């Protein structure tokens, strides 16, 4: 598995050489950010520059091509002006799932209010409902179902935050504080994540009913 601390040091060195004082924030998301990475985990790097142009994107791409494990690098890049103008409901997951490496997202987090959290739940539930119905009717894909349960786990994090004011990163910790319906979603997600057996019909019906419930709660 990648020694992420050493890899990030190399990444930061290259980034600073490439963009110098224009680097406003660097962070790590996903399994490496949570300390749950495996050999197959992507490296989800967040970079925010003072501003971002199409030329900057090409420059960043060239920089990434010079790094080890290029095939695993993904993540997000933007300008500060872009992220400060972003849809606040999207910023909820973005900010709380990002481990800072350089700089701070405090200015961005100040944009997240109760309304943004409620919208994160409602929009997430709507998207899951749509994806679930489409998959039940057309694709019938186990991979799509896994992705939908992953998305649902993010919605559960927002639900717990709404009720407690605490953002809980780790799924096993979510199990301790969720109600029965949300616990069932997290348990199923963890089963799928760990390669468990997929019951496409039952798991789809459970997810459909759960997303439908949260859409109605947003009325």
PLM feature segments, named:
Residues 1-17, 33-39, 50-219:
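Catalytic core of pol beta-like nucleotidyltransferases
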Residues 21, 41:
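Structured loop/turn residues at beta-strand edges in well-structured enzyme cores
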Residues 23-32:
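Short gly/ser-rich loop at a beta-strand->alpha-helix junction or flexible surface loop bordering the NTP-binding
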Residues 46-48:
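Short hydrophobic/aromatic beta-strand micro-patches
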